[in-house]
């Protein structure tokens, strides 16, 4: 959406309600009602739309939509998947989330699940690092979705 479309499309409502898995566990983004084309040569001002708790903080202040708003929402979704619930207040505990990836993995995991194997733990830590990098306060410090998908 961000890199393969011209002009780029910003979804503006990436959340656990707008992503479904198919039978092969491949994710599909739904609900493009709030999507917006990003025009490089004009203002990308936007009204505030999206699901509470997933909206990038800068959108509330600047009302300017960028691809990095979707990246932030994706970071929230990643942590929600790992934790088993929306990270909510957990996000406000850390001024710079990417510097706190040294958190104990068991503090982040869904407590309803069994302790994962070492291989799975390594993958979960990688996912946490990606999720935290997507939540950087400065939108320019967030990765692109193209980098996230690698």
Predicted regions and their residues:
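Iron-sulfur cluster-binding cysteine motifs and their immediate structural context
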Residues: 22
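Protein kinase catalytic-loop region centered on the HRD/HxD motif
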Residues: 2-9
């Amino acid at each position: 959406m961000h890199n393969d479309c011209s002009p780029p499309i910003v979804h503006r409502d990436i959340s656990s309600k707008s992503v479904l898995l198919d039978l092969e566990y491949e994710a599909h983004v739904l609900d493009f009602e709030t999507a917006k084309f990003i025009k490089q040569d004009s203002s990308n001002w936007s009204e505030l739309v999206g699901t509470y708790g997933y909206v990038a903080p800068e959108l509330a202040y600047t009302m300017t939509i960028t691809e990095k708003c979707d990246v932030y929402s994706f970071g929230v979704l990643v942590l929600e998947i790992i934790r088993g619930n929306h990270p909510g207040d957990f996000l406000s505990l850390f001024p710079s989330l990417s510097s706190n990836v040294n958190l104990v993995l068991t503090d982040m995991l869904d407590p309803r699940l069994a302790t994962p194997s070492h291989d799975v733990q390594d993958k979960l830590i990688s996912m946490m690092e990606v999720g935290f990098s997507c939540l950087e306060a400065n939108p320019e410090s967030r990765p692109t979705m193209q980098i996230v998908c690698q």
